[in-house]
Amino acid sequence: MIARLLSAPMLIAAFAILVGTCVDALVKGVAPGAGLHHLLAWRFLFGALLSLAVFLALRKPVPGWEAVRFHTLRGLLQLFCAFTFFYALTQLPLAVATTLGFTAALLVAPVARLLLGEKISPIAAGATLLGFAGVAFALSGQSGAGDGAGNQTLGLISLFSSTIGYAFVLVLLRMRALIEDATTIALFTNIVPALAMLPVTFGLFGAPDGRDLPVFALLGLLGYGVWYLATLAYGRAPAQRLAPLEYTSLVWSALLGLVFFDEMPGWQLWVGAVVIIAACLIVAFEGRFRTRREARLPASDLPE
């Protein structure tokens, strides 16, 4: 049964997205009372302990110094993305944060151009502009969030900072995913932020409420699971097959926001989300269609 599930990468990816959305909802509910710094420190500590245990149990080889330096940079960037995104979750409706988070996919092309020298096609550039037009329309229906308009402004600044950082994380991950396994990548994703947050863990900024520790442990478990499952799925199927599944998180976030936080997204958000998703799909599939055109193949593998 387990082998059959592991052979279904789309199912693995879909489940990872559902779990990730549940993590976002849990953070939104817990962070204001527990303290975001405590949540991050202990979430990554528990995630690091779990990922290290799996790494040792599977007897994975220790990466070389070059890989360690690379993953240290990526791990610190991951911590920045987690902090800014989690803060945004406390200030914005869950569905809004999820929708605007999709823009990270639109920023991958410019980041890949910067880091890898990849050329940005006119179609990708146009799709990026279309996506941010969708962002503007989605925000047009927002009258405020959190405790006031100031909180919404800070939330949006924090969220877009997170998406820019996450675009860098995705490109960096792509540079290593072909030569390293999911276990090693998941280990550094957790252990580097955990080490960086040790001053908080050791109580230099106050002690957390002991009743919150089980929740932090759950976040560490779920956070590790999301990264491991996602890396596992993307190692078994082309990214273009799995990428559209990312947008199912909007449905889950809207449902969880309504049930647990009494958040009802306006119609502008849904229209803007459709525009953003369409732009992301154009970016995701444009390279495939261009390659098939150059090879004089049909645009689709479906029978005509």
Over which residues does each language-model region extend?
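C-terminal transmembrane-helix exit sites in multi-pass transporters
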Residues: 104-129, 251-270
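Cytoplasmic-side transmembrane-helix entry/capping segments in multi-pass membrane proteins
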Residues: 9-14, 66-76, 120-133, 155-156, ...
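Helix-helix packing/entry segments at the starts of transmembrane helices
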Residues: 97-103, 176-192, 227-258
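Transmembrane alpha-helical segments that form core, pore/gating elements
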Residues: 51, 145-205, 294-304
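Membrane-interface helix-cap regions at the ends of transmembrane helices
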Residues: 48-67, 135-148, 192-212, 218, ...
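Transmembrane alpha-helices of multi-pass small-molecule transport proteins
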Residues: 9-12, 33-80, 130, 165-169, ...
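Hydrophobic transmembrane alpha-helices of multi-pass small-molecule transport proteins
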Residues: 123-142, 268-287
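Loop-to-transmembrane-helix transition segments
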Residues: 7-16, 55, 60-84, 153-162, ...
